[in-house]
Amino acid sequence: MSKRRVVVTGMGMLSPVGNTVESSWKALLEGQSGIVNIEHFDATNFSTRFAGLVKDFDCTEYMSKKDARKMDLFIQYGIAAGIQALDDSGLEITEENAARVGVAIGSGIGGLDLIEAGHSALVEKGPRKVSPFFVPSTIVNMVAGNLSIMRGLRGPNIAISTACTTGLHNIGHAARMIAYGDAEAMVAGGAEKASTPLGMAGFGAAKALSTRNDEPQKASRPWDKGRDGFVLGDGAGVMVLEEYEHAKARGAKIYAELVGFGMSGDAYHMTSPSEDGSGGALAMEAAMRDANITGTQVGYVNAHGTSTPAGDVAEIKGVKRALGEEGSKQVLVSSTKSMTGHLLGAAGSVEAIITVLSLVDQIVPPTINLDDPEEGLDIDLVPHTARKVDMEYAICNSFGFGGTNGSLVFKKIAE
């Protein structure tokens, strides 16, 4: 059967550099860092004392305080981004179309804040003091659940959780649901709030985080020789995906077309990528096959680019492998994690939005802090300054613990 076309008609975002898509995009193009010192708990004894935090978030713009008390912050962030995306799309939910509009929003970790609080209540005060809302306030599918309740969305309701590939996988699978007729529209993405004591301690114990405590805004430096680990970030990114003819019929504005989705597994290591980049390459190759394009047609790759010694090099090897010699010579590759940090389960969806905006505005955001590039990469990593470009296709990559990889291909919509 022939697939139906899928387009992006709405976007919403909370990130360390802005609480809307517009403010985040402006900050990224200007090369602003959203990394700050941690002040919401005492991080004195932690090896890493900074993160990419959401600032000045007011939950009452999106829900009542009563409802918010039953939700971990990752749920609140996801709902906020979802409401932004739905409002941006102009898609009206009616009794007639509700069953054809679904939600696919996940989280890599879920409600760490309230898990920690629930455990403290159990240990210090006993089982009767654990909140009756403990489970629904922390599990990963409750962004999708709560948003569907708030907006009356009765189509497919899922929450894929695949570590740092969560947001991208939810978008990719939501697109396939539309392509194969399960829905006319899907609200898709990821949300995360892992900058908690347990989250910071866990990633710190794994030696995954940068410890550049004297220069937090310079800590996330993908492909730079001085990189020493990733910077944890919080936030949410959500898209409204829609069947093309459905979007056209209602006069929706269309940002871009999602033409390719690919997945793969490294089958290599619990936390490290395959050194030759072959796992990531398989995902990119699958996405390009799905899009029916070659490597020479790709203008931009929004890289996973986390600022880890092994991962950054492996990804560039994968890009070269997937795009080929000619494609690699002309493509621009950048990592916006240099500014936002790594949003874990929200990274792929936030960066998918960034990739779409790059196509819309024909400009590539920079990789900041790339002062001394790793030798031998031989690819344009867009250091320091955003770059205007003429392109039709762009790729977004996400790779996660356990070797779970995903790539999306977006296409510019013709005027």
From Swiss-Prot:
Keyword field contains Transferase: yes
Q: Locate the active site.
A: 164, 304, 342
| Stored InterPro entries | 3-oxoacyl-ACP_synth-2, Beta-ketoacyl_synthase, Ketoacyl_synth_AS, Ketoacyl_synth_C, Ketoacyl_synth_N, PKS_Beta-ketoAc_synthase_dom, Thiolase-like
Q: Could you tell me which residue ranges the Ketosynthase family 3 (KS3) domain spans?
A: 3-412
* One GO term describing the cellular component: cytosol
Q: Which PROSITE patterns match?
A: KS3_1 (PS00606), KS3_2 (PS52004)
Q: Where does this protein come from, organism-wise? A: Vibrio harveyi
Self-association and partners = Homodimer.
UniProt xrefs under Gene3D superfamilies: 3.40.47.10
**What protein am I looking at?**
3-oxoacyl-[acyl-carrier-protein] synthase 2
| Pfam families, sorted | ketoacyl-synt, Ketoacyl-synt_C
The role this protein plays is: Involved in the type II fatty acid elongation cycle. Catalyzes the elongation of a wide range of acyl-ACP by the addition of two carbons from malonyl-ACP to an acyl acceptor. Can efficiently catalyze the conversion of palmitoleoyl-ACP (cis-hexadec-9-enoyl-ACP) to cis-vaccenoyl-ACP (cis-octadec-11-enoyl-ACP), an essential step in the thermal regulation of fatty acid composition.
Q: In which pathway does it act?
A: Lipid metabolism; fatty acid biosynthesis
* Family membership noted in the UniProt record: Belongs to the thiolase-like superfamily. Beta-ketoacyl-ACP synthases family.
Record keyword Lipid metabolism present: yes
Please name the gene that encodes this protein: fabF
